[in-house]
């Protein structure tokens, strides 16, 4: 990506200086690149992953590459753009050909059709009008979101931000013209995510077909952040968190990820188990996550772990 040539680092006093080394692919994929954050207002209204990444390159780095973990969707998107340049294919086409089709992930897409949209889970939240820890309500009260979205999709009309947020997209773009990006926007199902997890658990093999080399899986699931701290329970690999201590029933070395709406997937090589838990909650507290995830993970390991 030649547009990153000459990128500078911003000092605390606003001064600029050359980085000790240019950012690497490894740093991009383990969130230590120092790239600008996706919340910057100058990054809105782009029409392609190529445009997005070109904008990232115009901003100075927030800190020296490799010195701080800072979860950064701009880095993940830059990785996706590298895929486009190296493969010569749009990101969505590459993912479809190399991953989704071989895994039979028929419901994984950035552009749900009418039948898929009708099955979309709505985002839930607490009932703030009548607080009750046991009661959740739909995040958006409109019960006809999928039908309205499909109508607008077919007409190429803009879809309101609130509707997109309820669907789980979380971005106010014209739906029919959305572009695929690694940082978010894909829809999927438990079956499809489970197939991905199974392939990773089997060191890159799914139904007797190798999709990733065993070395690639070892690399992505190995700690890539070195001594840079991430959080007390985890370090980071290539696009995945890696457990550095037993946590929520998962063993050291388990790897996986969680989404903004609290969906999680983990691969636990020690227990020979892959777990995908699909959740649609914006306001789930850290304590609630510990209780729910821990209970589900421990129950799954007890029932399906190596002892069985």
Per-range role (PLM):
Residues 256-259:
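Short loop/turn motifs at secondary-structure junctions and domain boundaries
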Residues 281-284:
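A short acidic/small-residue loop/turn micro-motif
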């Amino acid at each position: 990506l030649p547009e990153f040539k000459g990128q500078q680092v911003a000092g605390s006093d606003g001064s600029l200086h050359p980085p000790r080394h240019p950012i690497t692919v490894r740093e991009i994929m383990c969130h230590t690149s120092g790239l600008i954050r996706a919340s910057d207002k100058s990054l809105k209204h782009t029409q392609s992953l190529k445009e997005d990444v070109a904008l990232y390159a115009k901003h100075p780095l927030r800190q020296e590459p490799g010195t701080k973990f800072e979860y950064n969707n701009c880095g993940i998107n830059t990785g996706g753009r590298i895929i486009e340049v190296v493969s010569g294919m749009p990101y969505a086409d590459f993912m479809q050909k190399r991953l989704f089709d071989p895994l039979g992930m028929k419901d994984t897409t950035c552009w749900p059709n009418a039948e898929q949209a009708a099955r979309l889970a709505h985002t839930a939240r607490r009932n703030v009008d009548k607080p009750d820890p046991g009661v959740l309500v739909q995040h958006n009260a409109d019960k006809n979101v999928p039908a309205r979205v499909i109508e607008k999709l077919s007409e190429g009309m803009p879809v309101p931000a609130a509707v997109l947020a309820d669907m789980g997209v979380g971005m106010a773009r014209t739906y029919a013209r959305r572009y695929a990006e690694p940082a978010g926007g894909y829809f999927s199902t438990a079956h499809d995510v489970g197939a991905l997890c199974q392939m990773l658990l089997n060191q890159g093999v799914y139904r007797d077909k190798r999709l990733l080399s065993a070395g690639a899986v070892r690399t992505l699931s190995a700690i890539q952040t070195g001594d840079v701290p991430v959080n007390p329970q985890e370090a980071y690999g290539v696009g995945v968190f890696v457990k550095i201590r037993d946590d929520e029933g998962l063993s050291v070395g388990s790897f996986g990820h969680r989404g903004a709406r609290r969906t999680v997937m983990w691969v636990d090589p020690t227990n020979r188990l892959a777990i995908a838990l699909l959740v649609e909650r914006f306001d789930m507290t850290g304590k609630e996550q510990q209780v729910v995830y821990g209970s589900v993970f421990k129950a799954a390991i007890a029932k399906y772990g190596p002892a069985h």
